Curated annotation (Swiss-Prot):
Protein name as it appears in the record: 3-isopropylmalate dehydratase large subunit
Species name: Aliivibrio fischeri (strain ATCC 700601 / ES114)
InterPro entries to which the protein is assigned, alphabetical: 3-IsopropMal_deHydase_lsu, Acnase/IPM_dHydase_lsu_aba_1/3, Acoase/IPM_deHydtase_lsu_aba, Aconitase_4Fe-4S_BS, Aconitase_4Fe-4S_dom, IPM_dehydratase_rel_enz, IPMI_cat
Pathway membership: Amino-acid biosynthesis; L-leucine biosynthesis; L-leucine from 3-methyl-2-oxobutanoate: step 2/4
Entry's cofactor comment: Binds 1 [4Fe-4S] cluster per subunit.
Encoding gene per record: leuC
Residues that bind [4Fe-4S] cluster: C349, C409, C412
Function description: Catalyzes the isomerization between 2-isopropylmalate and 3-isopropylmalate, via the formation of 2-isopropylmaleate.
Catalytic reaction equation(s): (2R,3S)-3-isopropylmalate = (2S)-2-isopropylmalate
GO molecular function: 3-isopropylmalate dehydratase activity; 4 iron, 4 sulfur cluster binding; metal ion binding
Length: 471
């Protein structure tokens, strides 16, 4: 039997602390990221049992989910939000955990902050009480979301019981066409696998189209691994990864970095390793993507007609499509460009990094947001905001009629003041288009930052390729 291993298996095996017969192994956890929503009860549990945080140096907290993007006033998003943020401050102070609070220069969305500070490194196990922790897998780390009781367990022990997952390889062969982004790639993947196709698996994304991506693009892809049902998504580290890491606040320096890179270079799937499942896509066939339904797998190319429920052979998919079309207020056979958008949101842990800001600004420059559209640009962190302002992107956005906001999760989820009203239609760069995700009865269409900016200007969805050809 071959000893060849996948990248996931290498990282998993390296972190097994205890493997008792008949039980799931206990894994050591290298980094624990904490935010205000899923941590209060976990800290309460420590307090009740008289426990400390086992490794404060490996635990980092920030405020992101329910912060206001219009003011640094802790009261702005309502009483529950204020309580959660104040509680996080008290808990971090009491237990000695590093906190990047509302007024800190490193505050931001947890999955933007971790990578940009060098907290996230290849080969690590990383957890957070948040669904989209898979983002960090872009660095070749095993990163996944956990529940609040597990947050307490990791705070107390720096370990977690974790069953071995099945492995899936998603191979995006060849190069994408001009103007096709990481968001289009991952939406096309989910369109093929469906929103449940990765259930029970840890996915490794491979292929030329993936290795061609920048680190920010790779984070977008891994961020949405959970949206095809996977436990986590990984991309093997390479020179692109090492160049991104070098010089960041918590990254290894000098000789330590050289030694780390030597180890990180071994973090790749062995040539003869076998995956439990393989999915292949032709990158050249991927077009700009827009979701039409109420899960990320209900997605089409921007120039394709809205599908008819009867086009689905599976009765469950057919029923789901009927329900989604009714909720979204769409008619099969029509084009998504036939429908006006009311709001546009560029942000979230999927697409709020500096390259996302630049992509949206390139479309916004010299143009104007349609009069009936409210368009928000929400940088993912204070660091992203500062860099964007240094480059003058905020001025481009404001002159075009976009709102330039403060960092936070914002309109990705209805936990702060940025939300949709009933039946409002939104072009959003976030990761979930579930019913009510952005506000009760709100209608969410997931797109790339460039596609979102273009929709803001046209007032409806347009094929980004027609705009870039004119530019």
């Amino acid at each position: 039997m071959s000893n060849a291993k996948t990248l996931y298996e290498k990282i998993y095996d390296a972190h097994v602390a205890v493997a008792a017969e008949g039980e799931n192994p206990i894994l050591y956890i290298d980094r624990h990221l904490v935010h205000e929503v899923t941590s209060p009860q976990a800290f309460d549990g420590l307090r009740e049992k008289g426990r400390k945080v086992r490794q404060v140096g490996k635990t980092f907290a920030t405020m992101d989910h329910n912060v206001s993007t219009q003011t640094k006033d802790i009261n702005a998003s309502g009483e529950m939000a204020r309580i959660q943020m104040e509680t996080l401050s008290k808990n971090c102070e009491e237990f000695g955990v590093t906190l990047y609070d509302l007024n800190h220069k490193y505050q931001g969305i947890v999955h933007v902050m971790g990578p940009e500070l060098g907290i996230t490194l290849p080969g690590m196990t990383i957890v957070c009480g948040d669904s989209h922790t898979a983002t960090h897998g872009a660095f070749g780390s095993l990163a996944f979301g956990i529940g609040t009781s597990e947050v307490e367990h990791v705070l107390a022990t720096q370990t977690l019981k974790q069953a071995r997952a099945k492995t899936m390889k998603i191979d995006v062969k060849g190069k994408v066409a001009e103007g096709i982004t990481a968001k289009d790639i991952v939406l096309a993947i989910i369109g093929k696998t469906t929103a449940a196709g990765g259930t029970g698996y840890v996915v490794e994304f491979c292929g030329e189209a993936i290795t061609d991506l920048t680190m920010e693009g790779r984070m977008t892809v891994c961020n949405m691994a959970i949206e095809l049902g996977a436990k986590a998504g990984l991309i093997a580290p390479d020179q692109t990864t090492f160049d991104y890491i070098a010089g960041r606040k918590f990254s290894p320096q000098d000789a330590d970095l050289d030694a780390a890179i030597e180890y990180w270079s071994s973090l790749k799937t062995d040539d003869d390793a076998e995956f439990d499942a393989v999915v292949t896509l032709d990158a050249s066939e991927i077009k700009p993507q827009v979701t039409w339904g109420t899960n990320p797998g209900q997605v089409i190319a921007v120039d394709a007609p809205i599908p008819a429920p009867e086009s689905f052979a599976d009765p469950v998919e057919k029923a789901s499509a009927e329900k989604a079309l009714a909720y979204m207020g769409l008619e099969a056979g029509k084009s998504l460009s036939d429908y006006n958008v009311d709001k546009v949101f560029v942000g979230s842990c999927t697409n709020s990094r500096i390259e996302d800001m630049r992509a949206a600004a390139a479309i916004a420059k010299g143009r104007k947001v349609a009069s009936h559209v409210q368009a928000l640009i929400v940088p993912g962190s204070e660091q992203v905001k500062a860099q964007a302002e240094k480059e003058g992107l905020d001025v481009i956005f404001k002159e075009a009629g976009f709102e330039w906001r403060l960092p936070g999760c914002s309109m990705c989820l209805a936990m702060n003041n940025d939300r949709l009203g009933p039946h409002e239609r939104c072009a959003s760069t976030s990761n979930r288009n579930f019913e009510g995700r952005q506000g009760r009865d709100g209608r969410t269409h997931l797109v790339s930052p460039a596609m979102a900016a273009a929709a803001a200007i046209a007032g409806h969805f347009v094929d980004i390729r027609t705009i870039t050809e004119q530019a």
